Amino acid sequence: MVYFRQIFLMIIVVSLHCCKVRFFCIVANAKELDDWKVLTVENGERYRTHVGRYAGEEGGEKIKLRVLEKFRALLDLIKPSTSRRRNLAESASFSPWPAPSPSPFPNGGPIESPAYPPAPPRPIPPHLRRPLPQRTHPLEQPEIQRRKHEKGGTFKKILVPVVASTASAIGFVVCVVGVFCLCARRKRKMNGKTLSFKRKKGKSQSSTRKVSVNPTLDFLYLNSLGVDLERQNSVSVKEIRETEKDLNGINGGLLEEEVKRSIETEISHDWDNASSYSTKEIVSVHENDEEQTVNSVSVPVVVINDSSDDDESFHSVGGGSQYSNPRLSNASSASGSVNVGSSQRFSEHKLDIPECSRSDFGISVSAPPPPPPPPPPLPQFSNKRIHTLSSPETANLQTLSSQLCEKLCASSSKTSFPINVPNSQPRPPPPPPPPQQLQVAGINKTPPPPLSLDFSERRPLGKDGAPLPKLKPLHWDKVRATPDRTMVWDKLRTSSFELDEEMIESLFGYTMQSSTKNEEGKSKTPSPGKHLLEPKRLQNFTILLKALNATADQICSALGKGEGLCLQQLEALVKMVPTKEEELKLRSYKGAVDELGSAEKFLRALVGVPFAFQRAEAMLYRETFEDEVVHLRNSFSMLEEACKELKSSRLFLKLLEAVLKTGNRMNVGTIRGGAKAFKLDALLKLSDVKGTDGKTTLLHFVVQEISRSEGIRVSDSIMGRIMNQRSNKNRTPEEKEEDYRRMGLDLVSGLNTELRNVKKTATIDLEGLVTSVSNLRDGLGQLSCLASEKLKGDEENRAFVSSMSSFLRYGEKSLEELREDEKRIMERVGEIAEYFHGDVRGDEKNPLRIFVIVRDFLGMLDHVCRELRCVRVPNSPSPLAPFR
């Protein structure tokens, strides 16, 4: 603020100085103007003098006013534009009157004209102000110079404040920059002092921040600490004492805080790099504010274990009353720590544990066993820095440490463990000793297993406290509860229904015994050492072998006899046929059979049977032959019945007649008119021709006409007459017409039942039937070749040949009958095609297409009949009135 005030005062002084110079210039110009007026006017001396005084006084006031306005404009109190307008108005109001013309008598003349004094000027309001009268005579040279001088002065009036303001702003900016530079320089000096102090402290403590790490330690037990301390060689008593002197020599709370901050910073950087070792030893050397002596050195050693077992415990070992300010390490919340202190000298190589601490914690320590012989030397590990991981901010840890210290100090008897000071030369670490037996009251001897993150093992407990067995899961989607609305699940009560645990476990529990048996069986069977087949093919053979569910000896015996295998087993055997290369590998294998897998053993046994897979195919053919023959015979008989139904159906022929007459009537005058026959494909197009109302089709009209004609025919028959006599004789013609229509619709709709075999035949594939007959013929020929040629003359194959010979005779007879049926049916189908379509030898690719067309037409006819039953005919002479 002081610099800012000085800068502001400097700006004001510079501005006032500029305005003062300008004021003196304006006063000089005003005096010259008065002198000129006195010299130029000879007559009217008093008038001129009076005007000059008036102008001088008014000019002085105007100059003062202008200076004041400029100063206000500089301070941003008023705008320059407003002052400019005000100056113009005042100059107009105080402008002098024009000078009178000179006298006509230059020498004075006889009569001297009196000079009248001018009237005092009155101020004119701005809104009534008139423009000045124009001069009739040219301006004189002094007036022109005066105006030029005024113009130059106006420019100077504008330039001077601008330059002054700019200079003041630049000066202010320069001052501010200088202040910031001074502050930054001072701060840099302070940081340099702090860094130099930290360097000195780092050099003094570098001797105590090196310690060797033994990765083979087991820090869960106290004996391992002693063994490890015997191998430590990086810390010396002299270095620790020198470090304590340096630490005690520091005075001031600020320096102590900086030291702690620097150490904690090094801890945070080194902690991440120290995770590669399984064990870490942390030594922290801190000073005591109360005692400034060398003997007050405190060296707590914090042992950190990376594992997070539940059996880890906190052990505190103290050795005297100087541990008045203990610190605990918070490196890991689940790791144990051991604090080892030396009271006055490091020559006492013992760790003392008070009896009070043992009694409080219930720990009994047994003597460690003798150390084993040292192993061969191991490569040396790099030393790690000492990490001070004390967190005094934690109130709970401080309270716990103070309590432990009091118990340790109050103890009288102690149990000591020998600890040797590490030598200057590093020695290879021995293998870890066996763990000490720690017996804690209320805790088992063996440590509990580590916590597992597998939530599937954490099963809920039942009423008796035992874990509930795992059942088969029911997959569903949970519904989240909504507090703002009521749901049906809120009304359920948990106590209203209880499960029968025994029943649900017996029904939906996992069969653990079977799985264990399977595992035992798998473990007993040794894994094969050799594989003759490819893994993928071997996997397929293994799956098919499970489907057989029989041994190799049973299969080979059944193949030799030609009987004894079911259809499923024969199908699996046929699928297991190996290739020629695989069969050659199996035959040429001379090694131990036990080394092969189960599938390879089975295949090798089958390969030893002559024509084993051909026998299986022959037996499968015999098993399926009868079913194939029955299916073909049923299909042929169905085709024959369908052909008979189409030829003998009187109603179908009547329907074709109605369609032919209707089509010829509609095609009158066209090339399609006058037809005597049409292909049955036209039946499917009747529903595409719609009437004028957009609903009635040509099929509706045909069905209506046939129903009416068939109804009249039925009523004229003997049965119709009997029914008419029983009914009322006084029926109206409309009622009779309705009866005719109803009886005719019943007859037309019965056409679906009459042509039922035609509808079934439409689903038959005639080419498939012909192919099936051909396959049966080929299979029977292969079976005959196998039995009569390949296996003939061998005594071992006599049973198979005899069983197949009887089947060959039956098969040949059945196939001969099938050939005759096939020939007859194909002739009937050809006759039906010619019966309806004429000569279609080269046009019809599918001989059964006629049956497909009739099936589709019967479906359309049944739909139209259902529609006509739902519509009642009104009192109208036209039968198609309901469709208009």
Swiss-Prot record:
Query: Which Pfam families does this chain map to?
Result: FH2
Would you indicate the residue range of the signal peptide? 1-18
According to the entry, every stretch annotated as the FH2 domain falls at: 461-884
Q: What is the superkingdom listed in this entry's lineage?
A: Eukaryota
**Residue stretches of biased makeup (Pro residues):** 97-107, 115-126, 367-379, 425-436
Question: Which UniProt keywords are given for this protein, alphabetically ordered?
Answer: Membrane, Signal, Transmembrane, Transmembrane helix
Q: Where is the composition biased (Basic and acidic residues)?
A: 346-358
Note down the stretches annotated as region Disordered: 89-143, 307-384, 416-469, 512-532
Any Gene Ontology biological process: actin nucleation
Its family remark reads: Belongs to the formin-like family. Class-I subfamily.
What is the protein's given name? Formin-like protein 11
Which species expresses this protein natively? Arabidopsis thaliana (Mouse-ear cress)
